[in-house]
Amino acid sequence: MIAHLIVALLAMPVQSFFFDFGGHQAQQQTQQTTSYEDSVLNSDCKGYVCPYTNECSRGPEECSCPFPRSQLRCVLPNKQVVCISKPATNDKKLNDVYDDTAKGPRARNKGVRDCGWVEAAYKGLV
């Protein structure tokens, strides 16, 4: 009986470590973070603050995508920018095109959801 009690007492720190019964995780979550609104309002940017990256630019058409390694930056006919996931393909040549920041957004491949597909959808052709 006493042996079981000792084992239970020795196991409590391990349980606390894995399951955070001490409530330390909740304390970490209460740290104050700067809101998106505050970061935009307190920006030194004299131009346009891009909504997803908070970078300063001359206008929305210059904003980059938040995840450029996995997204294509498509510019619509009205100059708005839409970020889409790069097409998933096993074709190395196509992957190289989509990984190129200049060629990727201009690629128009039939049957692939790339910037060409986005433009067609914008025009109501899809």
Curated annotation (Swiss-Prot):
Keywords: Signal. Residues 1-16 form the signal peptide. InterPro entries: LCL2. Belongs to the LCL2 family. Probable component of the endoplasmic reticulum-associated degradation (ERAD) pathway. This is Long chronological lifespan protein 2.
